Amino acid sequence: MANVVVVGAQWGDEGKGKIVDWLSEQADIVVRFQGGHNAGHTLVINGQTYKLALLPSGVLRPSKLAVIGNGVVFDPQAFLDEVKKLQGQGVAISPENLRIAENVTLILPLHRELDATRENAAKAGAIGTTQRGIGPAYEDKVGRRAIRLMDLADLDTLPTKIERLLAHHNALRRGLDQPEIDAGQILADLSAMAPHLLPYAESVWRLLDIKRREGKRILFEGAQGALLDVDHGTYPYVTSSNTVAAQAATGTGMGPGAVGYVLGICKAYTTRVGAGPFPTELTNEIGEEIGRRGKEFGVNTGRKRRCGWFDAVLVRQTVRTCGIHGLALTKLDILDGFDSVEVCVGYKLDGKEIDYLPAGEGAQARVEPIYETIEGWKEPTANARSWAELPAQAIKYVRRIEELVGCPVALLSTSPEREDTILVQNPFEA
């Protein structure tokens, strides 16, 4: 399989950035295919920390081509700010090594404002969005009124498209008792940014098709996690896009046959940001300790993550919905030193045992985890780079996870550093 798709197998924040960066050394092209700048990730390379939100991890690798696909919602100002920050850290970013789908949907300030207004008005019913305009931008895309990157190249037709967009948004704003938006200001702002954005514009589906036919290795970089998928996640506490592996095809314009190997990333425990069901959540001192050790705070938002034991039911479900061939297990070192660890092997729902997470919101809130206790390990796993360096009990824990989710571990990460990775099976050679 020449191409690899990386997806989160939990609720996001699984450590995809490090794994993608590690794999990108073997790839020619790294592609983002969904989401926006709401899903940040941190990379530590030679002691230098890089925080990415919108840009593919491939930008940190010289000689690699980074691509933002049509499935992404693209905030022009966030993009320019992120590029400037990374360039200040010595990262070279230009149209030579970064291409953006010309048909990508733009996130505008009005999307961010609407996102925040809705979330604040919802109060106790808030979903927990990042308030960065992701959902409203996807709404406009589906509603066929979005402004796309290619529209900035035609200033004759852009005003008409802005008016069509505002016919919807100004009606919403009147209902929310907010002032209407001036079309002229949006036109002026987009016109000013156009010269800085259009040099990156590309017919991405065509570019990737050419590269694939040339035999180039393509790495598809997913954002967030499969349990936040708008269809297969814990709805309505989900994101506004499809985050499962199949989106790699539609989010780039490539056919399903181009996808190849699917690598699912999951932590050795479970975390979640924001509201929504979390069967194995630990609201005690153990949960606090896991969060402290794992530095479980959002890269972009700084929000504290909820922590819990590994949920094999959920990861097994994700293996099925994403067609995952192998797992990359991260943050095993965070569990070092515990006398024992728990793994969720099933649920009880209204007194009945089940082996999946039901789709209904009420049922998801009522499921109770069934745990299996596994002996812990005292020896450190941190910075291990081979199986021989791992404690025997830690290996047993990994093997039990494989059995429970029905999928082999292909990679094991033992620290944020790129080199602290144990390779079991190379996804590009599987």
Curated annotation (Swiss-Prot):
Give me the residues that bind substrate, please: 299-305
What are the EC numbers? Answer: 6.3.4.4
Associated pathway: Purine metabolism; AMP biosynthesis via de novo pathway; AMP from IMP: step 1/2
**What cofactors does the UniProt entry give for this protein?**
Mg(2+)
Name the UniProt key words of this record, in alphabetical order: Cytoplasm, GTP-binding, Ligase, Magnesium, Metal-binding, Nucleotide-binding, Purine biosynthesis
The GO annotation for biological process reads:
'de novo' AMP biosynthetic process; IMP metabolic process
Q: Tell me which InterPro entries the record gives.
A: Adenylosuccin_syn_GTP-bd (IPR018220), Adenylosuccin_syn_Lys_AS (IPR033128), Adenylosuccinate_synth_dom1 (IPR042109), Adenylosuccinate_synth_dom2 (IPR042110), Adenylosuccinate_synth_dom3 (IPR042111), Adenylosuccinate_synthetase (IPR001114), P-loop_NTPase (IPR027417)
Matches recorded under PROSITE patterns: ADENYLOSUCCIN_SYN_1, ADENYLOSUCCIN_SYN_2
- Which reaction equation describes what this protein catalyses? IMP + L-aspartate + GTP = N(6)-(1,2-dicarboxyethyl)-AMP + GDP + phosphate + 2 H(+)
Pfam families referenced in this protein's UniProt entry, alphabetically: Adenylsucc_synt
Main subcellular location of this protein, as a coarse class: cytoplasm
Q: Which residues bind IMP?
A: 13-16, 38-41, 130, 144, 224, 239, 303
Q: Where, by residue number, does the polypeptide cross the bilayer?
A: none
Q: What does this protein do?
A: Plays an important role in the de novo pathway of purine nucleotide biosynthesis. Catalyzes the first committed step in the biosynthesis of AMP from IMP.
Name listed for the protein in its UniProt record: Adenylosuccinate synthetase
Which species is this record about?
Answer: Rhodopseudomonas palustris (strain ATCC BAA-98 / CGA009)
Q: State the gene name recorded for this protein.
A: purA
